[in-house]
């Protein structure tokens, strides 16, 4: 399960950006063509955040659909796999979205001093 290593990296990046502040929420964008399983990330998140500033944080995942642009006609089509056929019959597609993995938002607890 490569999601465990991916989740460890996400926790490390968020921890670095939080600079010691308690993290309340993390929003990820995961492309549907990325071969990353959101449910596995959720499972690993609970394990990887134990004893960190992310412990107890809410994890939200926004799944980004696959979208391709035809090199022949310029048309755009939604993809559920990294290849497809355009309405014009061409298989020459460039992926626009669907392979991403982004930490989109981090919400931290504000400390009043």
Swiss-Prot record:
Gene3D superfamilies in the record: 3.30.2320.80
Pfam family, one: HypA
Coiled coil: none
An example Gene Ontology biological process: protein modification process
Binding of Zn(2+), residues: 70, 73, 86, 88
Gene Ontology molecular function: any one: zinc ion binding
Record function comment: Involved in the maturation of [NiFe] hydrogenases. Required for nickel insertion into the metal center of the hydrogenase.
Record HAMAP family: HypA_HybF
Name of the featured protein: Hydrogenase maturation factor HypA
Species this chain originates from: Nostoc punctiforme (strain ATCC 29133 / PCC 73102)
């Amino acid at each position: 399960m490569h999601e465990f290593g991916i989740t460890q990296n996400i926790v490390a990046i968020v921890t670095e950006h939080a600079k010691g502040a308690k993290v309340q929420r993390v929003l990820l964008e995961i492309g549907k063509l990325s071969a990353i399983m959101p449910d596995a990330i959720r499972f690993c998140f609970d394990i990887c955040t134990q004893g960190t500033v992310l412990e107890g944080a809410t994890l939200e995942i926004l799944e980004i659909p696959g979208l391709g642009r035809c090199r022949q006609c310029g048309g755009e089509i939604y993809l559920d796999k990294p290849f497809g056929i355009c309405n014009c019959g061409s298989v020459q597609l460039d992926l626009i979205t669907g392979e991403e993995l982004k930490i989109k938002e981090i919400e931290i607890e504000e400390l009043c001093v």
